[in-house]
């Protein structure tokens, strides 16, 4: 189990309170699909995923990105209980969707990039470290069903 210090929790929650879920979620998922195009196979039903402008402007991508970040909000609220918090989503992504668990890490890294670009100087190295720790822990929790 990952332990978050009080300072890390404060850094994470202070940033989370400023996140526009639809905007950041859509950009995070869009970047994942553009930077790692093999991930597009999980989203074929979302329509046109080429060129990159089509991905970034796709309302289904934005909506799903918001859904992903809404789920991540559960991590922010339950940092001390990530395994149980994401047990159902781990099972869904493993058994039904067959998502390679490495993609969870890639998505987390895309989120950190988006947060940094949206928040600028407020997203300090210390804040980034806390967020990297959180997204890695969430990726691990989502991967548990695979083991």
UniProtKB/Swiss-Prot annotation:
Give the CDD domains listed for this entry: Hb-beta-like
Q: Is Metal-binding among the key words of this record?
A: yes
GO terms of biological process kind: hydrogen peroxide catabolic process
Residues given in the record as heme b binding sites = 64, 93
Query: In this protein, which residues make up the domain named Globin?
Result: 3-147
Keywords of the record? Heme, Iron, Metal-binding, Oxygen transport, Transport
Question: InterPro entries in the record, alphabetically?
Answer: Globin (IPR000971), Globin-like_sf (IPR009050), Globin/Proto (IPR012292), Hemoglobin_b (IPR002337), Hemoglobin_oxygen_transport (IPR050056)
- Molecular function GO labels: haptoglobin binding; heme binding; hemoglobin alpha binding; metal ion binding; organic acid binding; oxygen binding; oxygen carrier activity; peroxidase activity
Recorded GO cellular component terms are: blood microparticle; haptoglobin-hemoglobin complex; hemoglobin complex
Describe the function of this protein: This is a minor early embryonic beta chain.
The subunit structure is:
Heterotetramer of two alpha chains and two beta chains.
Name the protein family: Belongs to the globin family.
| Listed name of the protein | Hemoglobin subunit beta-Y
């Amino acid at each position: 189990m990952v332990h978050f210090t009080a300072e890390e929790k404060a850094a994470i929650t202070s940033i989370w309170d400023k996140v526009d879920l639809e905007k950041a979620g859509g950009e995070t998922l869009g970047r994942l699909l553009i930077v790692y195009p093999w991930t597009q196979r999980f989203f074929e039903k979302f329509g046109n995923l080429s060129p990159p402008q089509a991905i970034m402007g796709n309302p289904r991508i934005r909506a799903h990105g918001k859904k992903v970040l809404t789920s991540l909000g559960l991590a922010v609220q339950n940092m001390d209980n990530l395994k149980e918090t994401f047990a159902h989503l781990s099972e869904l992504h493993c058994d039904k969707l067959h998502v390679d668990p490495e993609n969870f890490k890639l998505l987390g890294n895309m989120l950190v990039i988006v947060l940094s670009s949206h928040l600028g100087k407020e997203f300090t190295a210390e804040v980034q470290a806390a967020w990297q720790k959180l997204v890695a822990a969430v990726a691990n929790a989502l991967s548990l069903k695979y083991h």
